[in-house]
């Protein structure tokens, strides 16, 4: 079985997100050097917000810095330690960090949150499990936001394949989607909007000198918006939870 057909375990994820990253995460927030998806979340999320699978915590910390009331959870103890330490160093009292397995019932009451989001989690599960998780999470929030890799992004798809061929891909099973509307619908979530973001970020998966980069640079020079062409790295799906 290929390493790329298996989901990473807790220890493998902990190698990506741990206290060694503290200064880097804090610097991102202090210098306003956050990812395009963290920026996008500040445009969407208001009120009480829950992040499921917070990883480095950068998105939750950025939302907290921008005045949101945030709860962040992860099943990796090292991730939780990292985000708690970063929040303390940034003096952010409006972010709560919880160690919790998101594949099980969550320790919240129904509709406790205005927004629930995951960015970079659901792509590591097969479709049936994605739907089960969405259905479970939806009971705790009013709106659901999903950000997963975009299967229509040519630079991301080619770059990922190149890394798999070279044995340098680090994230195990990762299933991009052209659309996530059906999964939302089957989970009882009414889709309100779907689009892509991060076309520039998608090109980071490619070698620095690659003809696909040159092709997309020409498109941009000619006035094309690559996100409008569904070439963003992340597929953003927003929906209203029933109940």
Annotated model-derived regions:
Residues 123, 149-151, 196:
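Histidine-centered beta-alpha loop that forms part of the nucleotide-sugar donor binding/catalytic region
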Residues 68, 142, 189:
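Short phosphate-binding/catalytic loops that engage adenosine nucleotides
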Residues 97, 193-243:
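A C-terminal cap/extension of S-adenosyl-L-methionine-dependent methyltransferases
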Residues 171-188:
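Short alpha-helix
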Residues 1-110, 115-119, 134:
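Conserved N-terminal segment of class I S-adenosyl-L-methionine
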Residues 125-136:
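A short, conserved alpha-helix within the catalytic core of class I
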Residues 149-171:
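Short, glycine-/aromatic-enriched active-site segment of Class I SAM-dependent methyltransferases
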Residues 141-149:
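Conserved beta-strand signature within the Rossmann-like core of class I S-adenosyl-L-methionine
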